[in-house]
Amino acid sequence: MARARGVVLGYRRGTNTQYPQHALVKLLLDDPRKAGLYVSGIAFYRDRYGNVYKGRVLRLHGRRGGVVVVKFNPPLPGQATGGVVEVVKAGGDG
């Protein structure tokens, strides 16, 4: 199973609206164009208290940056910005 690490950049937001359940995650890959392979994968974030937040990779954000949109339930806290996320690729083959 393919795994990748990523960094939480912040919430998806607009001019007047913020979506705390949607986090922008920059995947740390050798080739950022391969971020699309992780769409529909599962993301995990663990805070310093041991709480685990689970989310699903919804789509790419931007064209070539290696950034994806992840929907977490429950939403990530604001302190997660800059934290490390582990993303597991969907499918069994890897």
From Swiss-Prot:
Keyword Ribonucleoprotein annotated: yes
Sorted UniProt keywords: Ribonucleoprotein, Ribosomal protein
GO molecular function, one term: structural constituent of ribosome
Tree of life domain: Archaea
InterPro entries hit by this protein: Ribosomal_eL33, Ribosomal_eL33_sf, Transl_B-barrel_sf
Entry similarity comment: Belongs to the eukaryotic ribosomal protein eL33 family.
Protein name: Large ribosomal subunit protein eL33
Source organism: Aeropyrum pernix (strain ATCC 700893 / DSM 11879 / JCM 9820 / NBRC 100138 / K1)
Lineage of origin: Archaea, Thermoproteota, Thermoprotei, Desulfurococcales, Desulfurococcaceae
